Each structure stands twice: as C-alpha cells, then as structure tokens.
C-alpha cells in the first residue's frame, strides 16, 4: 500500500509541475474566402503572341521577350495586356496582370452582340456583326480570342484593315467597348417616347 500511495503522489506532483498546454484553434487563422479570391480564378487567359525584342546599348545587345495576352471571364468582361521580361513566363505574368487592369464590360444580347459595329485602332479595322444562335464564332486570328473570352458564342467578325495582331486585338476591343445595350439601341433608333401635351383652350370672343 505504501508503494502505491507514493506512486500516486509522484504522478500528481508531475502533473502539477507541467504547464497546461493551450489548444489553439487554427480555423480563425484561415484567410476568409471572399469574392476577391475567386475573381482571379474566374478569368481565363490566352497568349496571342510571344516575340523576342532586342535592345542595342553600348555594352552590346540585350534580348528580352514581349508577350501579348488576352484575359476574360466569358461573362462580358475582357481585357488586353502586354509584358516584357528576360524570361517568357515572367513576360506572360506581367501581361496577365496588365490585362486584368484593362478590363472592359461588353453588353451581350443572349449569345451574341446587340448590333453591328466597326472597331478602329491604327491601321486595323474589325467588323463585328450579330449572328443567330448556333452560328458559332466566325472569326479568325487574334479577334477570335477576344470574342471567345468575352463570352460571345455567335458572331461574325472580319478584318477590314491590316492584320497586325496587336492592332486587330485593340480594334476588336474598341468595337466591343462601343457596343450599346439593346434598350439604348432601341432608344437611339426610334428616339425617346414623345409625351403629348394638350394645347390650352382659348375662349372665343364674340
């Protein structure tokens, strides 16, 4: 009995000397999942062109890479960005960051655009026309990337000027940014409703 009591007393003494460990709940330390975190994931990106540029200095030639990227959420938002860096991935990263700063809102009418428009930039001109459902995107080159990432599923697009990729993209974005909603097009076409006012009656003098 004496041995048992000594063991129990010793265990109690050890438990009293050891400090209590605090249990920390790690859940509050997690970052709140807000809409800003998912906003970046909603955007898709397409690399249009990557070219090597040369800068001649007194020390010699310096080679860098220039990337042109289009981003969009396929819900009416699209943007263009360019970036330069010594490595291709870094140039693409800079272009994507710039494209997200240059987003524009494109008014959609179902799966197509509200009306016909011609976008201009430099020597580039792009004609954009609405199409019936099921037509698809009839466009080529860089303009197709912009239209698809904007969320337009049925449309006609044709280049009327130079086929420089950057000029075509900027001309397409210029055309999409000048689009009006269906209601505004209706107001511009037929005019605002006219409110009829009755003329005041004038009593005839005998």
Swiss-Prot record:
Residues 43-106 form the S5 DRBM domain. Residues 1-42 are annotated as: Disordered. SUPFAM superfamilies: dsRNA-binding domain-like, Ribosomal protein S5 domain 2-like. GO terms for cellular component: small ribosomal subunit. GO terms for molecular function: rRNA binding; structural constituent of ribosome. Keywords: Ribonucleoprotein, Ribosomal protein, RNA-binding, rRNA-binding. InterPro entries: Ribosomal_Su5_D2-typ_SF, Ribosomal_uS5, Ribosomal_uS5_bac-type, Ribosomal_uS5_C, Ribosomal_uS5_N, Ribosomal_uS5_N_CS, Ribsml_uS5_D2-typ_fold_subgr. It comes from the Bacteria. GO terms for biological process: translation. It holds the Pfam family Ribosomal_S5. The keyword rRNA-binding applies. The N-terminal domain interacts with the head of the 30S subunit; the C-terminal domain interacts with the body and contacts protein S4. The interaction surface between S4 and S5 is involved in control of translational fidelity. With S4 and S12 plays an important role in translational accuracy. Located at the back of the 30S subunit body where it stabilizes the conformation of the head with respect to the body. Part of the 30S ribosomal subunit. Contacts proteins S4 and S8. HAMAP family: Ribosomal_uS5_B. Belongs to the universal ribosomal protein uS5 family. This is Small ribosomal subunit protein uS5.
